[in-house]
Amino acid sequence: MRHLISMRDIGREEILNILDESERMEAILNEKGHCDFLNGRILATLFYEPSTRTRLSFETAMKRLGGNVIGFTDISNTSVTKGESLADTIKVISGYSDLIAIRHPSEGAARLSSENSKVPVINAGDGSNQHPTQTLLDLYTIKREVGHIENLKIAFIGDLKYGRTVHSLCQALSLFKGVEIKLISPDELKMPREVIEDISGKIKLSEMTDVEIDDVDVVYMTRIQKERFVDVNEYYKVKGIYRLSKEHIGDKNVVIMHPLPRVDEIDSEVDTLPQARYFKQSFYGVPVRMAILKLLFEDSVK
């Protein structure tokens, strides 16, 4: 694995290898909190869009591996404001670092970066396109909290049009046998047809607008992404259309996930329920990203 840009680029066996390595990283964290696999190495985090969990978990992961971090979170302090191209930025920064994690508002920016980099590039989110490291931590959460990925029944609820985490996860789940997916969203925020076409025939799909979660293993809530709407009035038409409450959950044997940040789509009272695993899901970002960084670096020096 030279880069991690899209879930389309990696197969089932590579996914399982990353999940196994993530388990080893979690064991190291629980046992001693750190290791020196990437001692003396540098990760560059290039965040052209705001981020809390992804950026901080990448930085934490690199430091837990014994490495160091450089990067930026505010492009107003970079040469981007002078008109420097993304390709030139990557060519320069790949000379300073051993790995690059990039988040960018433009679809395809991570792929372009990989084509201009001397070191492995990790897509930390490119517009509404892909977010592969989130997908891998989602799969790890499912494996740890549900116990299986094959024969999984999962409901995705909310913004399925702009939700890059949902696009990536659906594509990954299509590699596993017996998966059933419910896509629950308003008509304005349905899953893009290209994603549907990519996974149809590989898994059982159903689309609906009403919340039906009685027979699923996982409920995956998503935020309605205001920043993706060209017309803010369209956002307010769908804002708050789905809100998961204690009454929805009851005593169902279900795992509730959310890529975070949450706005109003999950009542805060749900946080105390045993079914709520979204904060644990966020924690899993550290061992999973440790595994990704370690494996990518090892492959780059073979």
UniProtKB/Swiss-Prot annotation:
Q: What EC number(s) does its UniProt record assign?
A: 2.1.3.2
Catalytic activities: carbamoyl phosphate + L-aspartate = N-carbamoyl-L-aspartate + phosphate + H(+)
InterPro entries from the xrefs? Answer: Asp/Orn_carbamoyltranf_P-bd (IPR006132), Asp/Orn_carbamoylTrfase (IPR006130), Asp/Orn_carbamoylTrfase_sf (IPR036901), Asp_carbamoyltransf (IPR002082), Asp_carbamoyltransf_Asp/Orn-bd (IPR006131)
Q: Which UniProt keywords apply?
A: Pyrimidine biosynthesis, Transferase
Tell me the protein's name.
Answer: Aspartate carbamoyltransferase catalytic subunit
Q: Which residues bind L-aspartate?
A: K82, R164, R223
Pathway given for this chain reads: Pyrimidine metabolism; UMP biosynthesis via de novo pathway; (S)-dihydroorotate from bicarbonate: step 2/3
The record's HAMAP family line, in alphabetical order, gives: Asp_carb_tr (MF_00001)
In which domain of life is the source organism classified? Archaea
Assembly and partners are described as: Heterooligomer of catalytic and regulatory chains.
Do the record's keywords include Transferase? yes
Q: Which PROSITE patterns match?
A: CARBAMOYLTRANSFERASE
The entry sums up its family as follows:
Belongs to the aspartate/ornithine carbamoyltransferase superfamily. ATCase family.
Task: State the Gene Ontology BP annotations.
Answer: 'de novo' pyrimidine nucleobase biosynthetic process; 'de novo' UMP biosynthetic process; amino acid metabolic process
Question: What function does this protein fulfil?
Answer: Catalyzes the condensation of carbamoyl phosphate and aspartate to form carbamoyl aspartate and inorganic phosphate, the committed step in the de novo pyrimidine nucleotide biosynthesis pathway.
Q: Which GO terms describe its molecular function?
A: amino acid binding; aspartate carbamoyltransferase activity
Give the matching Pfam families: OTCace (PF00185), OTCace_N (PF02729)
Q: Which residues bind carbamoyl phosphate?
A: R53, T54, R103, H131, Q134, L260, P261
